[in-house]
Amino acid sequence: MKELTREAFGRRARGGGIVPVYREFLADMETPVSVLSRAEGEDAFLLESVASTDNGGRYSFLGVNPYATLYAQDGRVFLRTPAEGGRVLPEKDVLAALRSVFREKRFVADPDLPPLQGGAIGYLAYDAVRAFEPRVKPVPEEGMPDAAFLLTDSVLVFDNRRRTALVVVCINAELPGAYDEAMRRIDALHAKFFRSDRPRPPARAAAGAAASGNAAPGASGGGTFGGFTPEMTPAEYAAVVEKCKEDIRNGECIQIVPSQKFTMETSASALALSRALRVVNPSPYNFFLKIGARTLIGSSPEELVKLSGRTCSTCPIAGTRPRGATPEAAAALERELAGDEKENAEHVMLVDLGRNDLGRVCETGTVKVDSFARVERFSHVMHLVSDVSGTLAADKDGFDLLRSAFPAGTLTGAPKIRAMELLAKYEKSPRGVYGGAAGYFSFTGAIDFAIVIRTMVLEGRRLSMRAGAGIVADSDPFREYGETVNKSKAAFEAAKFAETL
């Protein structure tokens, strides 16, 4: 088993700074979910890839008990610590505040460790765009922060190939006895989360019998879908689509992506919902983020931005068909999607938007399309997917990269700013986290963020999610309503399943 020895720590610590110390443990009798179950009630995160489309992800990242929480609300940014409580920071937007926090630390990255070695893990809600673009004024969701991040100096890293877990603790090398203190914290974390005799709390909430989630997905009773109630009827959504099409004909936009909200009451716990969703809808970005009274449970297929070294990337997804009930039906739908002129035109537009987003922060001439318009199959739908990459400019960092791409054009339309202005007029309720970003800024400089789609938000017993459809000039209004339902089916199924766990 690997560990950072005292001698190796001494070499890394010669110049001072924050040094990650680690020890590897056998984890063949544990899973990230079983360990997460022992953190129930605590602020916590679990980030992993469980998608069969990319052979799954090697690493799962888990953390609890952050040393601070940074969040933005009502035009101010706050930092809260267990010792000091909350204080207002001078920065006016959350990305500037996070950059300042990171600059206070001189981090000695370990090239032998996975990219997340401590940092900020959380989300930017769609409404955070107000801090970046004054022209856009989305109505915020009541009580929902514009952004919330857990600041952590300890991470559990599951290596899903080796069936081991690294416990990583970041320590100020200038503290007396720093190495011993780091090892003490590592042993304490291992004892807390990996002792087989520790009781595990039940996954199901104490509320008892299942609430309203007993209808099969797509059931017609009461206009619900698997217990979720949509906020718009097909006719109401179609009316919004017609308004968007009129704006497009008038030259206001090329595409607009109106969404709708689905809500239900549930007896399932956040952990049960997470377990169900990762089985029902395994995705490249499965995440669990509990910050305060609110938990995000997501299975997003779409990368917003990623930075590894100086290479940055984005992964536009646009164009959708149902998965198909049989292999023959799936193959026919795949051919239909690949040959659909409307879907391909929409995809080209959004790939160009992704290239422009990267072009604002990349070295001139380095942005390229690595893979274009391949069909990828997910659990309930298939999409057209492309990969765009570039080399980050020397004077830019991960905070600049996220700012340049936020929010994703695939969730707003194009041009972005005008599309967002129109969405503020047409959508029936605030977007909240939908269309925002969830992921991490590592102390190493690496970042990895998914677009917040296929994501449920649990607060108390209230469970909600949103889905949208990309509207262009020749969109069929009722078909687009069906697309919002198709994109939500994994959540409908997972919520029903979770109430049996």
Q: Whereabouts are the PLM-identified features?
A:
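Extended alpha-helical targeting/anchoring segments
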Residues: 1-501
